[in-house]
Swiss-Prot record:
Function text: Assembles around the rod to form the L-ring and probably protects the motor/basal body from shearing forces during rotation.
The protein's name in its UniProt record: Flagellar P-ring protein
GO biological process, one term: bacterial-type flagellum-dependent cell motility
HAMAP family: FlgI (MF_00416)
One GO CC term on file: bacterial-type flagellum basal body, distal rod, P ring
Length: 390
């Protein structure tokens, strides 16, 4: 019996390697395979956020009731039993603490409730909540969350949550089999909490607004400042650093701050960024910015093959002999490496990495081929930009 298995084949085949070399030569001698590199403008509201206008996280501890025997095991979840006792006491029902341990309840589960309080949320408005099991409940399907206060980091109650839970999952089974779809121990309640208290946000109280860039960059901050000053007048805006721009509210907008903010956020500007290539060899993902440039470099790309052959020899004793049949495995390993071709890529002008990617995709180069080439070019100092390997 003979088994042959090819374990791994890395990099390019000879035919694709020659196509790769030819394509790189054409690129670096001036042929443009890319589409238009026109820079797209972005609104200020899409790349920056007004300082102080943000959401706040809320959290609470509550009980889910009405479960079909899939709740917490009271013998293992002491906090669930304690929560039930506290709830019954607040409802005016007197229970003997010593008898609580003998009570068997299977339709109740302890849960953590989280929510995000949006900015400018007013009292009485509704927000979505997320519910997740805290104990050993098998499923929260069909349960109803009892009234649960949601607090902020200052321990103040900002919302009250209650309502039937929607999980979009199920889990059923017995002792020998079980069927489950999605995750039955977490779910959501749309509009499940009512806002009771608000977080005060007074924008422009000191006559200024500060915008924080999502991606700090000196060029983007400068472009944003110039665009605002062009529309509202000189010295209206000035950059604090690479990530912040401060705007002086004009006197005629002092009573119309909301209108001024809307006008500012609708301005189109050109956002800049650091030239960067991000690769993930585990998934074969390559993400690159259009500003990455390459200089003159020599590239050699070879082909490596690793072949492992396994065979089994059978040793059988003679008739009537005192022995047993023995199977002996035999492994043969061979490694072949084809010679890589060295080509000098000499350019008069820098070529973008996007042009190289488009050309390589046209000849069928895989993302892992690009990763190997880009890593080598970066190590040679010919890539002008960051190479990030995840």
């Amino acid at each position: 019996m003979f088994f042959s298995r090819k374990i791994r084949s890395l990099l390019l085949t000879p035919k694709r390697r020659w196509s790769l070399i030819l394509t790189l030569c054409l690129i670096f001698t001036g042929i443009n395979f890319s589409t238009s590199n026109d820079v797209q403008a972005s609104r200020i509201k899409d790349i920056a956020q007004l300082h102080g206008v943000r959401s706040n996280q809320l959290i609470g501890y509550g009980l889910i009731t009405g479960l079909n025997g899939t709740g917490d095991d009271m013998k293992k979840s002491a906090f669930t039993l304690q929560a039930i006792y506290n709830m019954m006491t607040r409802s005016g029902i007197t229970l003997n603490p010593s008898e609580m341990k003998s009570i068997k309840i299977k339709n109740v589960a302890a849960v953590m409730v989280t929510a995000s309080l949006p900015p400018f949320a007013s009292s009485g408005s509704k927000i979505d909540i997320q519910v997740s099991s805290m104990g050993d409940a098998k499923s929260l399907a069909g349960g109803t969350l009892l009234m649960t206060p949601l607090k902020g980091v200052d321990n103040r109650v900002y919302a009250i949550a209650q309502g039937p839970l929607a999980i979009g999952a199920f889990s059923f089974g017995g002792k020998s089999a079980q069927a489950q779809k999605n995750h039955p121990n977490a779910g959501r309640i749309p509009d499940g909490a009512t806002v009771e208290d608000t977080v005060l946000v007074d924008i422009g109280a000191d006559g200024t607004l500060t915008y924080q860039l999502a991606n700090a960059d000196f060029t983007t901050a400068n472009n944003m400042t110039r665009a605002i000053n062009k529309k509202f007048g000189k010295d209206t805006a000035y950059p604090l650093d690479s990530g912040s721009v401060t705007i002086n509210i004009p006197p005629h907008f002092s009573k119309r701050v909301v209108q001024f903010v809307a006008n500012v956020e609708s301005i189109d500007i050109t956002a800049d960024s650091v030239a960067r290539v991000v690769v993930n060899e585990r998934t074969g993902t390559v993400v690159m910015g259009q500003n990455v440039r390459l200089s003159t470099v020599a590239v050699s790309h070879g082909n490596l093959n690793l072949i492992i052959r396994e065979s089994f020899d059978v040793s059988q004793p003679a008739p009537l002999a005192d022995g047993e049949t023995v199977i002996t495995p035999s492994t043969e390993i061979s490694v072949t490496e084809e010679e890589g071709q060295l080509v000098v890529l000499n350019m008069k002008n820098d070529v973008s990495i996007g042009e190289i990617a488009n050309a390589l995709n046209a000849i069928g180069a895989t993302p892992r081929d690009l990763i190997a080439i880009f890593q080598a070019i970066k190590a040679a100092g010919a890539m002008h930009g960051e190479l990030i390997v995840l």
